[in-house]
């Protein structure tokens, strides 16, 4: 039987003018995903993927670098303007939005989509340091 050759689908260059930047900012990390208006991911970056480890992942600087990296990759696909949706209570929320603007993307709208429980699960206990 003949060997089956691996045919990998090459990543094609999408030409997307507008998109949505999803910023997920937790207490431990910040993840920035830039999608087209339908929700298909174009680029993403996170503080951990950029090499920040431990408590450095949760800093605003790490969030800024993650947003910058994701935005530059999206701009290679022709992105010019974005809507930003922010989720989570982390430290990198504002820093990520500011760095998206600084890279050269036009921010049309910022919305907070942090899930708020209607008295759902019990929250974690308070830290005593």
UniProtKB/Swiss-Prot annotation:
PANTHER family: 40S RIBOSOMAL PROTEIN S14/30S RIBOSOMAL PROTEIN S11. Part of the 30S ribosomal subunit. Interacts with proteins S7 and S18. Binds to IF-3. It comes from the Bacteria. GO terms for cellular component: ribonucleoprotein complex; ribosome. This is Small ribosomal subunit protein uS11. The keyword rRNA-binding applies. Pfam families: Ribosomal_S11. GO terms for molecular function: rRNA binding; structural constituent of ribosome.
């Amino acid at each position: 039987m003949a060997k089956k050759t691996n045919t990998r689908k090459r990543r094609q260059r999408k030409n997307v003018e507008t998109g949505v930047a999803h910023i997920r900012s937790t207490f431990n990390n910040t993840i920035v995903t830039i999608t087209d208006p339908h929700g298909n991911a174009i680029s993403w970056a996170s503080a951990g993927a950029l090499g920040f480890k431990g408590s450095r992942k949760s800093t605003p600087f790490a969030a800024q670098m993650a947003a910058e990296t994701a935005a530059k990759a999206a701009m290679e696909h022709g992105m010019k303007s974005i809507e930003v949706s922010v989720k989570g209570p982390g430290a990198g929320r504002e820093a990520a939005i500011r760095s998206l603007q600084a890279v050269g993307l036009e921010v049309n709208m910022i919305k907070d989509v942090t899930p708020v429980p209607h008295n759902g699960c019990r929250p974690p206990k308070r830290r005593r340091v």
